[in-house]
Amino acid sequence: MSEQEKDQNNAEPQVETVEEQQAAAAAEAVEPTAEEKLAEVEVELAKVKKALAEADVRAQAEVQNVRKRAERDVQHARKFALEKFAGDLLSVADNLERGLAALDAEDDALKGAREGIELTLKSLLDAFARYNIEQINPADEPFNPELHEAMTMVPVPNVDPNSVIEVLEKGYQLNGRLIRPARVVVSKAP
C-alpha cells in the first residue's frame, strides 16, 4: 500500500470518529437527563395544578351565580304570581265603584244596596292590601307617565299644567310593579 492509500484509510476512520462524536453529542443534547425530565414534569404539573385551581374557582362562582339566580327567580315568582289574577280582579273593583257612583245617595230605597256595595268594595280592597296590591288614585297630583295614562288633555284655567284633574279609572300596583296605570284627564295651559 502506498502512503497515500494509508493516509486515506486513516483519514476515513477519523472522519467516522468525528461524525460519531458529533452524533453522540447530539444524542446527549437531545436526550435530557433524568433531573431535566423531572424538572420539566414538575413545571408541567404546576401549570396543570394552577389551571385546575382556576377552573375550580370559576366553577364555584358559576354554581353560586346559578343558586342566586334560582333564588331570585323563586322570590320573583312568589312576589308576582298573583299578577294575572289580580289584573282580572281589577275590573270587579272598577264595576263596584261605578255601581256606587250610579246609585243615588239620597234615595232611601237604595240605601241597603249602596251599603252592600260599599262593604263588598271595602272587603275587596282589604284583600288587595293583604296581597300588596295598592290602588293608585292620583286626583289633583302632577301627571306621572310611569304611573298614569293620559286619556285626554283639557285646558283648565287656575290649574297647573300637567296636573291630573279627573281619574277615569284607578291604577294598581302589585309589590311596587305596575299592573295597570291610572287612566286620567290631564290639564294643559289654556
Curated annotation (Swiss-Prot):
It is found in: Cytoplasm. Keywords: Chaperone, Cytoplasm, Stress response. Residues 1-33 are annotated as: Disordered. InterPro entries: GrpE (IPR000740), GrpE_coiled_coil (IPR013805), GrpE_head (IPR009012). The keyword Cell membrane does not apply. Signal peptide: none annotated. Participates actively in the response to hyperosmotic and heat shock by preventing the aggregation of stress-denatured proteins, in association with DnaK and GrpE. It is the nucleotide exchange factor for DnaK and may function as a thermosensor. Unfolded proteins bind initially to DnaJ; upon interaction with the DnaJ-bound protein, DnaK hydrolyzes its bound ATP, resulting in the formation of a stable complex. GrpE releases ADP from DnaK; ATP binding to DnaK triggers the release of the substrate protein, thus completing the reaction cycle. Homodimer. Belongs to the GrpE family. This is Protein GrpE.
